[in-house]
A protein has these predicted regions:
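Metal-ion/cofactor- or nucleotide/acyl-coenzyme-handling active-site neighborhoods
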Residues: 1-237
Length: 237
């Protein structure tokens, strides 16, 4: 049996469409999530802890951090998550025995190079996720590579607060408290991932928009979530 999944069926599956990427910053609300019930959504990490608060379920889910998996793995495997579920097989270092689990190979070289040069190099990027997905200090980096591989034209991000200076750094509704202390420079490392996303997608056919309420991520055009959803609904009438 192969260690990694074959992702060929996902190539350009959503060509020209839009997606919403739900992250777990403190600005995330159930009201915002409920706006996205009819949208294509990616969610990550402790988003599974929202399932008892909403009928929304993601279209795709991803987890890449072994520490996060250690914290929520049992809940994840018992949850009613039934969408394609991407996970870093060599990062988490175990096979997840779920029928919808899709192990991918995380590529660490450029992440390591970026770290030892103190951010002076750009993080890697994979155009073919069958060959691996470039790793970064944030799981959103893997999500963006998958979304690009799938052919999405637009990606809207919510819950991307990128504020690591305050006492609250994760969503209360997602109920995730890291078991390890987050270093003070964590925000700088996460911003490296966002900067590399901007660089890699600059001349590609996928635009990123920030629909987060507040926060400190200013690398992408800001939009109001309800207006984006409302505009699309109006167009469909």
């Amino acid at each position: 049996m192969k260690k990694y999944a074959d992702f060929s069926s996902f190539k350009n599956k959503h060509i020209g469409q839009r997606c919403f990427i739900i992250l777990t910053g403190p600005s995330l609300t159930i009201d915002d999530i409920n706006l996205l019930k009819n949208e294509i959504t990616f969610s990550v990490n402790s988003c599974i802890r929202l399932f008892d608060k909403t009928s929304w379920r993601p279209t795709y889910y991803l987890i890449s951090d072994p520490l996060v998996y250690k914290s929520i793995g049992n809940e994840l495997e018992k949850s009613d998550l039934n969408c394609p579920f991407f996970y870093s097989r060599n990062g988490i270092k175990k096979k997840i025995n779920l029928s919808n689990a899709l192990p991918y190979k995380a590529l660490y070289f450029y992440h390591f190079l970026n770290f030892i040069t103190n951010g002076k190099t750009t993080l890697g990027w994979s155009l073919d996720i069958n060959k691996g997905i470039a790793d970064a200090p944030s799981c959103v980096y893997a999500v963006m590579q998958i979304a690009h591989y799938m052919g999405f034209k637009e990606a809207y991000v919510i819950g991307a607060d990128c504020n690591y200076s305050g006492p609250i750094q994760h969503s209360n509704i997602a109920s995730y408290q890291p078991k390890v202390k987050i270093p003070k420079n964590a925000g700088n490392h996460v911003l490296k991932a966002w900067r590399s996303i901007k660089i890699h997608l600059e001349n590609k056919n996928m635009k990123v928009y920030n629909a987060t309420r507040g926060g400190m991520l200013e690398l992408f055009p800001r939009v109001r979530l309800e207006e984006i959803v409302k505009e699309d609904q109006k167009w469909k009438l």
